[in-house]
Each structure stands twice: as C-alpha cells, then as structure tokens.
C-alpha cells in the first residue's frame, strides 16, 4: 500500500481488540506493514485477513507480553518476517478493580506484569535494532489513571504511573540515537478491557461507563498514534493526553 508510512514496519501489541486493533488498522491503511501480537491467535488471523483484503500487509505473532521470552520473540519475529521495526506500539493492557488491602497480590502482579513489564520487555528488545537503523518510534499506551491516582483501580493506576516513568526515562536514554518515545494517555474509551475486572459490580459499572455516548472510540486513539508516527523525525511528541469532550470521570 502507498501512504504516509509506506516502507515502514510496525509491531502492535494488544492487537486483538480495542486500541491495539484500531492502531494496527490505521497504520496499515497509512502504508505500514504491521506485525500483530496478542494472546488470542484467532482474532489476530482475522485482523490479518482484514488488512490483506484492504490491500495491506500484516502478520500474526501470537504471544503474551508478560512473558519476557514471548515479548522478545515478537520483536525478533517482526524483523525476521518483515525486515525491520520502525514503530512499536505497546497497547497490551488489562485492568483490575481493588486496592492494596482488598486485592490479592497475584492480581497486582498480573496487571503490573502485562501493563508495565510487558512494555519494558518489548522496548528493551526493540532498542538495539532501532539504534542500528538510526531511527524508530516507541509509542506506549497509558491512561489518565497514570496522571491522577484511581484508588479503586489500584494496580492499574500504579502500572500506568510506572509506565510514565519508564517512557520518559527511555526517551532521555535513546533520543540521541534518533529514537522517539511517546506516551498516549486516553480517558474513557469504549474497549473490552472492563471485561477482565473480577468484581461483577465494578465490571458492570466500568462497562456501562465506557459505553456512554460521550466515550471515545478506539479509532480516536488510533488517529493520535498515527499522528505521532507520521511527524517529521525532528519532532517527538513525548506526551499526549486525550480526553472525551464531555469528561465525567478520572478514567
């Protein structure tokens, strides 16, 4: 495909649904070849078919970013199958309701392993190849919960605050090598993420909240990701906060 990202290769984690899926479609439409990573292989294959039907190129790389081996393999396989890696979109994420006292530690670990450490693993694997190319874009998807603590979503908010520190530190570390590092912080967005909340009352409340007419759609966030990736190499949007026009909650 031709487009503003023609010749570029992107890896998108969390590509089986929500923001990751929308980002993959937007990047492919803009001309990038896209590697799709997530745990749900059948959804990835469906997305590969959709992109191919529209004239784009995509490959599926199933895996779990909370596994360092899987996350590293996603980067390595992207390069092996598509030739390089120009854009890394870290969109894989989960949410859980609860606080320090109420939520078991294994739930805290699961959220932090996916949202924070999973991003660390893919970033670490991508830095070397991007340095060798002299360029690259790393775009980490966070949340407004990474700007203002949301006590009822303790591990989620904690992981997103950590992601802010990781992103800014990495930007300082690799900017001199021509690698741009950005964080995108969406407010309420209509995705499937609330389905992972174990408490049924909180799950229903969160699902209802993101289903409101004023909630943003994954395509809205994908447009922001595309904007960042398409900017001239001299420009790095280090942080982008995106809220619904009618913003009724912290997240």
Labelled PLM ranges:
Residues 123, 159:
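Active-site helix of classical SDR
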Residues 9, 16-17:
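Conserved glycine-rich cofactor-binding loop
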Residues 143:
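Residue(s) in the substrate-gating loop at a strand-loop-helix junction
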Residues 32-47:
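Conserved glycine-rich Rossmann-like NAD(P)H-binding loop of the short-chain dehydrogenase/reductase
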Residues 99-100, 107-112:
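Substrate-binding pocket helix/loop in short-chain dehydrogenase/reductase
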């Amino acid at each position: 495909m031709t487009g503003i990202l023609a010749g570029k290769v992107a890896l998108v984690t969390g590509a089986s649904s929500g923001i990751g899926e929308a980002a993959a479609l937007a990047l492919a439409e803009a001309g990038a070849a896209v590697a799709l990573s997530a745990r749900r292989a059948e959804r990835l294959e469906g997305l590969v078919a959709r992109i191919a039907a529209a004239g784009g190129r995509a490959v599926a790389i199933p895996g779990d970013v909370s596994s360092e081996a899987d996350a590293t393999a996603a980067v390595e396989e992207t390069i092996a199958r598509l030739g390089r890696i120009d854009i890394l979109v870290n969109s894989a994420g989960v949410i859980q309701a609860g606080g320090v006292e109420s939520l078991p530690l294994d739930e805290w670990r699961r959220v932090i392993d996916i949202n924070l450490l999973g991003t660390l693993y893919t970033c670490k694997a991508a830095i070397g190849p991007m340095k060798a190319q002299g360029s690259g874009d790393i775009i980490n998807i966070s949340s407004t919960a990474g700007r203002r603590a949301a006590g009822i979503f303790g591990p989620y908010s904690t992981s997103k605050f950590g992601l802010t520190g990781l992103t800014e530190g990495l930007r300082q570390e690799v900017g001199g090598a021509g690698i741009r590092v950005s964080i995108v912080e969406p407010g309420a967005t209509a995705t499937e993420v609330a389905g992972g909340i174990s408490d049924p009352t909180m799950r229903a409340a969160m699902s209802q909240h993101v289903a409101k007419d004023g909630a943003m759609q994954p395509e809205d966030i994908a447009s922001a990701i595309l904007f960042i990736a398409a900017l001239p190499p001299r420009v790095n949007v280090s942080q982008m906060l995106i809220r619904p026009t009618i913003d009724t909650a912290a997240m």
